[in-house]
Design a protein with these regions (language model features):
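Mature soluble binding/inhibitory domains
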Residues: 2-172
Length: 172
């Protein structure tokens, strides 16, 4: 598929980006009132209502043993809006046991990239910390993190998360 975008900020920027599904043949089915595999139901958008504008997008695929999280947040120094203040991190586990409700992950920071451009010389992705994503239910989770490097080095904490939007069918 393809993502087409157009900014309305007067810059005239628009374009399209080819998309490729990272995990093929994802299927979900239900059996009675509960999903046959609750792991898929944990995928979605999560946030802390007290920190609007920040959160996680999580994709859990037990069929391929894959978990991916994108964390959008701000610099720990309280830098204002814009490039200097925004932070995007990704997180992946070294291994994942389907059915696990607590998932240890490595946090990665990518720097040097350019929007809607192929990989550029100097762009790099490095491990900058660790996190644990623990699901209490289909609607509540915690994100505990520690940064050991990168632009947020020394920061740590735990964030109580709520699901954005309705619960998947069969989730409680």
């Amino acid at each position: 598929g393809q993502l087409t975008y157009s900014f309305t900020d007067g810059s005239g920027r628009s374009g399209s980006i080819d998309r490729t599904r990272l995990t093929q043949n994802v299927t979900c089915s239900t059996n009675g009132a509960r999903p046959t595999n609750a792991d898929f139901a944990l995928s979605g958008n999560w946030y802390d209502p007290s920190t609007s504008g920040q959160g996680l997008t999580v994709d859990v695929n037990p069929g391929s043993g894959t978990v991916f999280a994108a964390w959008y947040t701000y610099a720990p120094t309280g830098v204002g809006a814009g490039v200097a203040g925004q932070r995007w991190y990704t997180a992946q586990p070294t291994s994942f046991t389907p059915g696990a409700r607590s998932i240890p992950l490595t946090i990665y920071e990518t720097t040097g990239g350019v929007f809607d451009q192929p990989a550029v010389p100097g762009a790099r992705t490095v491990a900058v910390g660790t996190a644990t994503l623990a699901f209490q239910s289909c609607s509540a989770a915690t994100w505990s993190f520690t940064f050991t490097g990168g632009s947020s080095s020394g920061s740590s904490g735990t964030i109580a998360l709520k699901r954005v939007g309705p619960l998947p069918r069969g989730c409680v």
